[in-house]
Each structure stands twice: as C-alpha cells, then as structure tokens.
Amino acid sequence: MEQAAPDPERLWQPAPLEPLSHPDAGLESMVGEETKGARDEGPGDGTMTENNFSLKKIEISVSEAEKRTGRNAMNMQETYTAYLIETRSVEHNDGQSVLTDSLWRRYSEFELLRNYLLVYYPHIVVPPLPEKRAEFVWHKLSADNMDPDFVERRRIGLENFLLRVASHPILCRDKIFYLFLTQEGNWKETVNETGFQLKADSRLKALNATFRVKNPDKRFIELKHYSDELQSVISHLLRVRARVADRLYGVYKVHGNYGRVFSEWSAIEKEMGDGLQSAGHHMDVYASSIDDILEDEEHYADQLKEYLFYAEALRAVCRKHELMQYDLEMAAQDLASKKQQCEELATGTVRTFSLKGMTTKLFGQETPEQREARIKMLEEQIKEGEQQLKSKNLEGREFVRNAWADIERFKEQKNHDLKEALISYAVMQISMCKKGIQVWTNAKECFSKM
C-alpha cells in the first residue's frame, strides 16, 4: 500500500528558526571545525593560505597618527587624521620581526571595512570601532576630535579593532581584510566591486520585520534585552566615572593651593621655613599627580566603551535573524495562499470573499481549459514555493547555529576582558590611595620636625 506524501505546508511551518542542536552543545568543536576549514580551503574561494596571517605569525600595529589636509568628494578642502598601519612578519629563523607592509588609512576606510564585514558576516558579532567623537567626557577632557590626546586614544582603539578582527577564526581569513592591510591604492574600489552595499539590509525593512514577525525566537529576544542591559549598565558606569573624575580633579588641585600657601609661609618663617617648604613641595607633587592618574583612567574607560559599542553589534545579529524569520513567514504565507487557490480551482468552491469570486460572478465561469492551465501554473508555483521554504528554513537553522557559536565566543571574551579591566582599575585605585597616604605621611614628618 502506497504511503501518502507528507504535506509540505505541515513540514515547513513558519515556526521560530531553531539551531540544529542546543547553542551550548558542541561549541568548541564547531569553532575548531571552522578554524580547520580555514586551513583546508584553497586560495580560489577568497581565503588566505599563502598570505594567511594569525597573531602568531604577523604583528599588526597602528603606530602613528598624522594630521593631513585634502579635498573630499565635494571638492572641498578638509582636515583629517591618517593612521599608519604596519604589519611585521615574525617567522624568520633569527626570530626577529621584519616589516612587510606599511600604509596610511583614514578613519572612514576603517568604517568601510567594518560595514563590509557586517554585510558578509551577519552571524558574527563584528568588533566595533572606537568613537569618532569623544563621549562621556569630564570638564578637563577635550571633546575636539582633533585633540592630540583623543587622536592617540583613537589610534589605540583602531589598532585594537584590527587585532580583534585578525584574531577571529573566520574574519581573519577574509580577502578584503587582508588587502586592507597590504594594498594602499585602489582598495576602496576593490571593496565597492564586491557589491556589498546592494546586499545590505535597509533600516526600514529591518524595522518592518521587527514589528511584523509573528513567531520570534525567544533566545534572540533575550539576547536583544541582554544587549540593551549591557549598554545601559556601561553607560551609567561611564557617566558616574566622569563625575568622579571631575570631583577628584578638584580635590587634587586644591592641594596645589596648600603647596603655594606653605611655600609663601616659609619665606617669612626662620625656624619653620625648611619644614614648610618641604611640605609645600609634597603638596605640589600630590596636586600634579592627578593628570597622569586620570590619563591612565581614560585607558580603562576606553575598554568599557568598546563593550558599550559591542552592544550594537549584538543587536545587528538579532535584526538579521528577525529579517530571516520574517522572510520565512512570508514565504509560508504565500505558499498557503497558493495552495488555497489551487484547491478552490480544483473543487470549484470559494471559501472566503475574494477578487476571484467577484470576477467569476461578473464575467462568468472560466472554461475547463483555462482552469486546467491555471491549476497547472499554480502547482508549479507551489512546488517552487516548497523548495524555497525548505531552503529558507535550512538557511535559518544554519544562521542560528553559527550565530550562537559566535555569541558564546563573544561572551567568553567579554567576561575575560571586563574582569581584567576592572581588576586593573581597582589595582590602580589602590596604588593611587597608597601614594596619597605616602604624601601626607611625608608632610606629617615635615611638620613634626618643626
């Protein structure tokens, strides 16, 4: 007895996209397979084998920033900052690093590279760029994007971005990234030839999918809430830190007044003059030390800002999943509609009010030949729709599996980096307090000798 063929509509219902296994299961093996695949693939598929670089083989640094003047696309003169990228090979017999490539890049070219990576690797939490303009500044910190201190911090941030990409098991194999480090001329044209702008999802389409998707995956909803919470917590932390920096700066600089008072006082005292002069010197040292302290604090603030911007990278992965889920639901809805039309034509009954029913009443029934032709056309469309739905579902499952693997990698990296940064910040604060105690101890000794 012949078994009835399963109903494709039943098989490919627009349920939330599911991974092939639990996100936590087999994570290490998946990452290992991807890394192994990078070694096994040939140069014809856009990966790097001859020129494959990892942090063990090539050192990447943004060693210098330079202020330049040129003309933009509107033929107007502008001032911008260019950054020198150097790559050094460390695979020589003597163990010495040798400069292989050096070129200059603008911040806008870093942005172009990241936009390309976002389009071609939507399942990856792409590392963020440092801020283009200073945020969460305290009153002594310049918000000018041409300020030398800000440019230096951005140089460090851009170097960190390149190291993040180079250490990623998938992004490091990208040909465009390799050319970014080695090809100064015509790099922009090479990127634009990939046509990545045409493949980018529009903001309107993404917003539409967010509100119209019927069966969102709960895990991605939780991930979106997690990214919002991460951004909120770090934002509050940076704001509090900026306020504390303002107050701390004021407290330290007040000690400069003490130093001046003690120095002037020493000029009119004969017996206590030396002690007052020494105490004033200690106060001046204490007051001037805050500049270096807050400069070190900015380094830790920049590490927090990196993960503030990582929150948007997480949301980009969520938006892509919502788009894929929405496309899947629309494909299933279209398939169901075509099946209903085919059934109505075959039985001659119309279940609901439709334009077809109105035209039939107005102009009469179709001939058997016309009906047969329409049924045949619909059956072909249904067959194509079933294949398309199956393809979208498999594509979605693959996206979820790869996305969760990278999200778990990101969370592990985030926990390690933030823990290290906060511990280092606490150690720095302890050191600062010890120096303060030492200054006041020295001042006390000066007073006791009077």
Curated annotation (Swiss-Prot):
Any one GO MF annotation of this record: phosphatidylinositol-3-phosphate binding
One of the GO biological process terms: endocytic recycling
SMART domains in UniProt: PX (SM00312)
GO CC, alphabetical: cytoplasmic dynein complex; early endosome; early endosome membrane; plasma membrane; SNARE complex
Gene3D superfamilies assigned: Arfaptin homology (AH) domain/BAR domain, Phox-like domain
Biased composition, class Basic and acidic residues, residue ranges: 33-42
Region annotation (Disordered) ranges: 1-53
CDD domains: BAR_SNX4, PX_SNX4
Predominant cellular place of this UniProt entry's protein: other
Domain PX: 61-187
Subunit structure as annotated in this protein's UniProt entry: Heterodimer; heterodimerizes with SNX7 or SNX30. Interacts with WWC1/KIBRA. Identified in a complex with WWC1/KIBRA and dynein components DYNLL1 and DYNC1I2. Interacts with BIN1.
Job of this protein: Involved in the regulation of endocytosis and in several stages of intracellular trafficking. Plays a role in recycling endocytosed transferrin receptor and prevent its degradation. Involved in autophagosome assembly by regulating trafficking and recycling of phospholipid scramblase ATG9A.
Protein name listed in UniProt: Sorting nexin-4
